[in-house]
């Protein structure tokens, strides 16, 4: 049976070795500790005590959508989690750029942005979506370091050869001869690849269009994201009708890992391992493929007793749609900031609920129960338990 642990901080807020739930209950009952975090459950001692610590290794399995982490000692696993990152960041950034550009056009005069790009001013510049994921990796590792006395961090740093993924037999000069060699432009190559016929209805002798399967903002102009369609099928897609065709394989995750792998290692001052070693060790231990198991193997786990993993979900901290246009204009986001915000944890009577939104000028609040039932209550009857700070921890029991 997997054990549940309670994490402990000393009087100065520095991490100690975790204890059992029974010992935590005794300390809380005797007034020797206080609760400072509900999930993962963490207490802080109010008395001086011995600070014996064991060497702890943290294994990190980085990723584009998910992060696996596992902290182990020589005998047992102390913490395990799989973090699910936000997936709508690129779309939200595109929407923000669109609104910013529209705002510039509505003003009487705005100095042009000629030659003042951030990219040319700062070394090590990263795209906002890439920087967000890199900072999310660093943030979750620093959070675990504030909860456990970590001595060593090991990160799996992989380099992906995208051309090798597309064509496993590629070698030598073939790297310099791409699929578009000897073609005038992308459109000419796509039409030739599709044999100058519609990929949907297979018509040839008609007007042909080159269509983006995914938007240019998210899918780019690469040939794999383009498909040949006749004028009729293209109009159907424009009107919102679905047409079946093979969607291209995305290499965003591989590109992302190639960009951030050394930045992540340098930021966390970590040791490095590689994917083929992780795969070999995982097979030797007969463990199923998962992010938490990969992190356990990366941390050099062998026969340590495992703990219940946490599922961590990254949430949006500001929702721009909550601010309504009730006064004839749209004020700045959260200008009238209420004490409670979405995803906060509150107590109503004996029930622990999550905040959905605050309305009626801060007098009422919408709450969501564990069965996703939304209820409406007066805000005066609500007691705050925990602010949502971007990450939501759920213990898998």
Label each PLM-derived region with a short phrase:
Residues 62, 367-397:
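Glycine- and charge-enriched low-complexity intrinsically disordered segments
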Residues 54-73:
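Gly/Thr-rich phosphate-binding beta-strand-loop-beta motif of the actin/hexokinase/Hsp70
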Residues 19-51, 179:
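Charged, flexible boundary elements
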Residues 6, 190-196, 206, 222-226, ...:
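Short metal-coordination and nucleic-acid-contact micro-motifs, chiefly zinc-binding Cys/His arrays
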Residues 199-228:
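Histidine-centered nuclease catalytic patch
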Residues 202-206, 226-246:
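Short Cys/His-centered divalent metal-binding micro-motifs
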């Amino acid at each position: 049976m997997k054990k549940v642990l309670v994490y402990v901080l000393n009087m100065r807020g520095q991490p100690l070795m975790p204890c059992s739930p029974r010992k935590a209950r005794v300390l809380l009952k005797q007034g020797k500790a206080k609760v400072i975090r509900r999930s993962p459950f963490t207490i802080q001692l109010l008395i001086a005590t011995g600070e014996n610590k064991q060497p702890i290794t943290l294994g990190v399995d980085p990723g584009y959508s998910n992060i696996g982490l596992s902290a182990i000692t020589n005998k047992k696993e102390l913490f395990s989690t799989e973090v699910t990152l936000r997936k709508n960041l690129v779309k939200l950034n595109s929407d923000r750029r669109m609104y910013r550009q529209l705002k510039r056009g509505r003003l009487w005069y705005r100095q042009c942005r000629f030659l003042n790009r951030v990219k040319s001013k700062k070394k090590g510049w990263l795209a906002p979506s890439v920087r967000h994921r890199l900072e999310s990796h660093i943030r979750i590792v620093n959070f675990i370091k504030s909860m456990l006395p970590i001595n060593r961090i090991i990160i799996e740093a992989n380099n992906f050869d995208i051309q090798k993924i597309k064509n496993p037999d590629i070698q030598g000069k073939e790297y310099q001869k791409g699929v578009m060699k000897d073609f005038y432009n992308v459109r000419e190559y796509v039409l030739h690849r599709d044999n100058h016929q519609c990929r949907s209805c297979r018509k040839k002798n008609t007007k042909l269009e080159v269509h983006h399967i995914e938007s240019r903002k998210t899918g780019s102009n690469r040939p794999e994201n383009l498909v040949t369609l006749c004028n009729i099928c293209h109009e159907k897609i424009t009107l919102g009708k679905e047409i079946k065709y093979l969607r291209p394989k995305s290499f965003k995750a591989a590109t992302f890992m190639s960009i951030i792998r050394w930045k992540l290692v340098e930021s966390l001052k970590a040791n490095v391992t590689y994917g083929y070693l992780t795969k070999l060790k995982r097979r030797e231990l007969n463990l199923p493929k998962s992010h938490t198991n990969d992190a356990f193997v990366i941390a050099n786990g062998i026969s340590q007793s495992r703990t219940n993993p946490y599922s961590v979900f990254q949430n949006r901290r500001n929702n721009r749609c909550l601010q309504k246009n009730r006064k004839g204009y749209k004020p700045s986001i959260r200008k009238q900031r209420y004490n409670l915000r979405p995803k906060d944890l509150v107590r109503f009577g004996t029930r622990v609920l999550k905040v959905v939104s605050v309305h009626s000028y801060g007098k009422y609040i919408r709450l969501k129960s564990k069965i996703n039932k939304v209820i409406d209550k007066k805000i005066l009857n609500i007691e705050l338990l925990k602010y949502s700070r971007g990450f939501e921890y759920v213990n898998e029991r």
